[in-house]
UniProtKB/Swiss-Prot annotation:
Keywords, alphabetical: Ribonucleoprotein, Ribosomal protein, RNA-binding, rRNA-binding
Gene Ontology CC annotations of this record: ribonucleoprotein complex; ribosome
UniProt name for this protein: Small ribosomal subunit protein uS8
Membership in a protein family: Belongs to the universal ribosomal protein uS8 family.
Upper lineage: Bacteria, Pseudomonadati, Pseudomonadota, Alphaproteobacteria, Rhodospirillales
Length: 132
């Protein structure tokens, strides 16, 4: 069965898993999802993730969620650019999330990265999601 918004599905699984105080959540694997998870791991929003093969050609990602003193580290995670409404931004037009406490994840010509990395590399792109 095809999925209209795979990244939106990943973000919803993370959001629902943290609301239910799950330690791990599982999602179908794709390179975009893995790249977004790598940014979340690097920025300290998740403990980590692992890719496992269910059968040849079908893989899944197991995501270890992170909590601090019993509270989810991710307070809010939301999709900005959707399949029906793509949102692109120059680096100068990119706004800070939660007064700099959160991050924006971008898909740029140099790969998927956080807004701080995009600012240092001076590159804009598609605004995938915001996390804080």
């Amino acid at each position: 069965m095809s999925m209209t918004d795979p990244l939106g599905d990943l973000l919803t699984r993370i959001r629902n898993g943290q609301r239910a105080n799950k330690s791990t959540v599982v999602s179908p694997a794709s390179s975009l999802r893995a790249n977004v998870l790598e940014v979340l791991k690097r920025e300290g929003y998740i403990r980590g993730y692992a890719r496992s093969e269910l059968r040849p050609g079908v893989a899944q990602l197991s995501i270890e969620l992170k909590y601090h003193e019993g509270q989810p580290v991710i307070r809010e995670i939301s999709r900005v650019s959707t399949p029906g409404r793509r949102v692109y931004s120059k680096i100068a037009d990119l706004r800070r999330v939660a007064n700099g406490l959160g991050i924006t994840i971008l898909s740029t010509p140099r790969g998927v990265m956080s807004d701080t990395e995009a600012r240092t590399q001076n590159v804009g792109g598609e605004v995938l999601c915001e996390v804080f």
